Amino acid sequence: MAGAASSDRLVTSFPLLDTADLFQDLSLGSDANEVPMNFTKGSFQHPYGHAPYGASSHGSERRPNMNAGNLLNGGDSIGSYPWGYIPANYPSGGYPDPRFGYDRNSNHSSFSHLMNPHSSQEVPSFDQLGYNDHLYSNHGLYGLYGNVIDSGHAYGTFGYDSWKLGRGWYPVDGYRKTRSFNHGRGYSDEKADRLNELCRGPRSSDFKNPQVLNSSMLDAMKQDVSAVDLQRYNGENFPESFVKAKFFVIKSYSEDDVHNCIKYGAWSSTPTGNKKLNAAYYEAKENSQECPVYLLFSVNASGQFVGLAEMVGPVDFNKTMEYWQQDKWIGCFPVKWHIIKDIPNSLLRHITLANNENKPVTNSRDTQEVNLEHGTKIIKIFKEYMSKTCILDDYKFYETRQKIIRDKKIKQKKQALDGASGETINLS
């Protein structure tokens, strides 16, 4: 999960409403009641670093395709229909990972004309709040189909397993609603669900939800510094030079997943990414000299890196954690965070990678390796940059999002089970 280029808003600093009341309050759009509840995500523990790695694992259970991890949508539409559809028989790009064209990275494709480069903010709904549902079920490892498109303006992806219940393909766009076929009507009578992935929280100056969250609400969602041990990160003694070290760029599809990575001390990439990182870990351990494996975290389409963590254990390919925003990541490994701050891409764009067609490191795919020389330069920039913000500022914001997502998933599961029971009775 990383890692494919990487994933789903009221917060615990003020009294939480009952789940039913929250959903009622969030149903601002005229179609909100038609959106099926379909989120799940697991156990929540203490603030960052207080929950042990692997505390909530379900190795024997496949997670449905999701992510989690939720950009806000504005939106425009063709005609009077604000929801876009892609036909069910639309050709798939056949990429190995549904969320990302390559591993966990979003990929440019020839379908950019399907995405909407414009936005409007007239009617807020679940989408704009970042609480969209229809998290995907796992038919196979990645779902029945796989495809990713990039609008050129924001990273987007098609929803998976949307063939169920007669649904056609539905697009998911990071910032904007997508253009629709046939004026918003596809091959289904039911409106498509779209999963939002948030690349930045309310700490960001370009956080796009002003009509729903006013300044006082956003202030209330800011993290109480006393709840997080900030002294554990950004230490002055962290080394800037290494005799041996390995560096990899990690691209997450949502800040929700990075939040949980810091909180639980674990990460998961795609099957290919997990194998690559696991091999690097064992190779580093076999080295006669100390050789740490560092992970440079960035959230897809965020325009920044969010920090640096160290891979401190091998991949457990049989353990699946339940708290990722998208329920599809198989396997996980422990990490230790050293630096947590927002570092803009502009500070790193001059560093180009020969092993990636001399592209800037900011244009890397998930698990892109960075050589020792460039990795050392990046560490120095990370340490020296005096950032005013970091993902820890939005701790309570993401905690509340996780609770809402989890409750919606539980409700959707219950509805699915109740529906299956009803069908069994009718057939008997």
Curated annotation (Swiss-Prot):
Cite the entry's keywords alphabetically. Cytoplasm, Nucleus, RNA-binding
Q: Predominant location of this chain?
A: nucleus
* GO process terms (BP): calcium-mediated signaling
Write out the annotated subcellular location.
Nucleus; Cytoplasm
- One GO MF term: mRNA binding
Residue ranges annotated as transmembrane are: none
Task: Write down what this protein is called.
Answer: YTH domain-containing protein ECT1
Q: Where does RNA bind?
A: 251-253, 257, 267-268, 300, 324, 329, 337
Q: What does this protein do?
A: Specifically recognizes and binds N6-methyladenosine (m6A)-containing RNAs, and regulates mRNA stability. M6A is a modification present at internal sites of mRNAs and some non-coding RNAs and plays a role in mRNA stability and processing.
For the YTH domain, which residue ranges apply? 245-382
What assembly does the database describe for this protein?
Interacts (via C-terminus) with CIPK1.
- Which chain positions lie within coiled-coil regions? none
GO CC annotation = cytoplasm; nucleus
Tissue pattern of expression reads:
Expressed in root apex, shoot apex, lateral root primordia, stamens, carpels and trichomes.
| Entry keyword Ribonucleoprotein | no
